[in-house]
Amino acid sequence: MSLKNAMTADFLRSAYGGESMAHIRYLVWAESAEKNGFPNIGRLFRAISYAEWVHARNHFNVLKDQVGDATVAAGGVFGLTNIVENLQGAFDGEVHEIDQMYPVYLETARFQEEKDAERSFHYALSAEKEHAKLFKKAQDLAKQDKDTDNSKIYVCPICGFTVEEEAPEKCPICGVKKDLFKEF
């Protein structure tokens, strides 16, 4: 299905830019966490980085018929300080997407009857809620100079849903089967 509405296309481009930056930022913060003795928080950053890549890929795929150059305006958290501040930046970014960005984008796509964009925004919004919880939990431990105790993290390759320890039988967001989840 081809996009018909410029506003939804602009929102997809903006979300693509933001998710792409989050993907790289989380990889940088993963390296920092690992170098500073927090290997499991590093794993969490890597897993959620992959989830952000999934979101960016989904948004990009909806834009497949939008050929040409475009300037993408997307906000992003910058800085590489310490584990607690990096986790706060990650949490704040997720909360911004949950409370401000994706609800507007989702309602606009719904109103404009852009079903593919609506699905992409729904997947991202739903997954970001889990990401925020995971970052907050990790930050609470890091404030006590403790690493998380996750031995495995699983990410849905379709919607970016992220869960610790064991993947569900099917993704609660998109329904994909457990055996397709990527393990970190």
Model-assigned labels for residue ranges:
Residues M1-F184:
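Non-heme di-metal
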